[in-house]
Amino acid sequence: MDFITINSGNRTEEFALKQVAKQATSSLMYRLGKTLILASVCVEREPVSEDFLPLVVQFLEKSYAAGKIPGGFVKREGRAQDFEILTSRLIDRTLRPLFPKDYRYPTQITLMVLNHDIENDLQVSALNAASATLFLAHIAPIKSVSACRIARVDNEFIINPSASLLNQSSLDLFVSGTKESLNMIEMRSLGQKLNALEEPLMLEALELAQKSLKETCALYEEAFTPYQNELLFKEGEGIVLNERLLDLLKNQYFDEIIKGIESSALSERENVFKEVAKKISEAHSEFSLEEIELSLEKVKKTEIRRMIIQDKIRPDKRALEEVRPISIESNLLPMAHSSILFTRGQTQSLVVGVLGMDNDAQTHENLEHKAPIKERFMFHYNFPPFCVGEASSIGATSRRELGHGNLAKRALETSIKNKEQVIRLVSEILESNGSSSMASVCAGSLALYASGVEIHDLVAGVAMGMVSERQDHAILSDISGLEDAEGDMDFKIAGNLEGITAMQMDTKMSGIQLEVLYQALLQAKRARKHILKIMHEAKEKIVINFSHLPQTEIFNVAPDKIIEIIGQGGRVIKEIVEKFEVKIDLNTPSGEVKIMGNKERVLKTKEFILNYLHSLDQELEQYAIDEVLEAQVKRIVDFGAFLSLPKGGEGLLRKQNMDKCQVILKEGDSIRCRVISFNKGKIALDLA
């Protein structure tokens, strides 16, 4: 067993090698303070034949890591929680670009949290543990990567803040990369205000992150290189294509290839290339269909990149900074509290907004928080197969859908003034040709306004792309699906005119230089300005239907009266909710009653509750201590019997009082009883 200690900045990381999980290709135990993560890499020795990278990353939290038993009916960890899925994606998106293009060995990276101190950053720790384990596995010539988080407190940037400091921050910036460049970014603004970060400040934060990553990666490579396994996979030359077939495609079928490139819809484009491949296969039997399809893909990609780099023209004839045409419609769904249909080119998002009560908030349990937390602002993103012309079933929420919804949520969260409101936005992607998550942000911002939610400002989103060839590169605004597939970068940026509220950057290269990222940030600001102008024009035309929006009425009663509103087994409150068609939240310690629904019904509900409590008080006032009554047994319970009293109301005859007189009662019996006390609005009885 070997121990390696890395001191970088304000962190001391410890790595125990060959201690546990020794049958894995490589494994280690990572420690940062009281946080322990078991990281392992397992590789199959037989490559797959399909043309994709068979990489799976799983980040797993164990409740015992924080000294907890899982909540819910089943007391064991079940399906992955949102935080686990999002962290798995974070690690996957960092590591995937580092693999050689022709790597085909099934590889699984597992991160298991065994112990956790909530002051430590689990995502940074997990990514660093994964990076170290992958570097030690030496399954391919993969560079060392690391991660850091940047916060901003009192206008000062802080590297790898504690959880306490992050709670005070106006910025949450997660960056990962190699010694040379950055290859993954996640950012969101934090706080009660919008806290959009200006582009020059964002560059400053990224420079600070890159400096930290450069130092950490250098330390990792120096420390871990002596312990690497023997290299499993040497990077080859890739697939060698037939030059004669390539020439044939360029000379005889080039016009048809261009037609396919210019087809805007994914399904239409795929059909064009299938027809071309079939046509060539029939005319030239010496080439296999697979060979033809690979060559077609090569010619298509080369031509798209040439058009963009040299001609400065995109496949759909747009200029590099041109945003697709935008249209916005509102109030399409009369029963929802808001609905916005945002269309940008062939990407269309229908965002529906619904307001709720405290008990509508989503409750989460994870290791990052001591107690369950309530998610009051929810953004759910759905990507049905028909939006890209596919005929397949709609299943469970995918990792991608969860990630896109989380990005849109982060973009809009700080724009909401009242953070106590419970809001659910749902984005239904009805048509997709790139940038659907950013269309969701635009529609979502307008849906908040249309729901009557007070916002600091509208927020717009745009996806930026890049095509790079040697020393030349071109930045693209509002990328289409084809440009995303054939380009080198997907950089989603959301914000207002002043700055950025959220962003997410992924790359297919080993990394992106800072000057390129800054160019993309400035170009995105120009695109955002154009989109926000259209959104503000649409906002002026939105008619908020306040009569349809739910109204909230809050009032207080004596805390001991809350149980009366609930009633035996919840009977009273159920009847009230069904009768008036409202939602009710009750706070027993404070006596607060919150009613939400149609304004007229809310007021009638409040009146009913107050009158009901008053009538109970009046019933109590009719009786005196030691008064003897003739009562009727209403219902029998485990702890006694509830009796219907002659002047109205009911009282409780406890079981012990019945037992001492050896009385056996049944419902409907009449019995003489005596009032012995009043307690919290209840009448206690004894046998007379």
UniProtKB/Swiss-Prot annotation:
Note whether Ribonucleoprotein occurs among the keywords: no
Q: Name one GO biological process term.
A: RNA processing
| Domain S1 motif, first and last residues per copy | 626-688
Task: Enumerate the residues binding Mg(2+).
Answer: D484, D490
Per UniProt, residues of the KH domain are: 550-609
Reported EC number(s) for this entry are: 2.7.7.8
Provide an example Pfam family for this protein: S1
Give any GO molecular function from the UniProt entry: magnesium ion binding
Q: Its function?
A: Involved in mRNA degradation. Catalyzes the phosphorolysis of single-stranded polyribonucleotides processively in the 3'- to 5'-direction.
Question: What's the name of the protein?
Answer: Polyribonucleotide nucleotidyltransferase
This protein's gene is called pnp
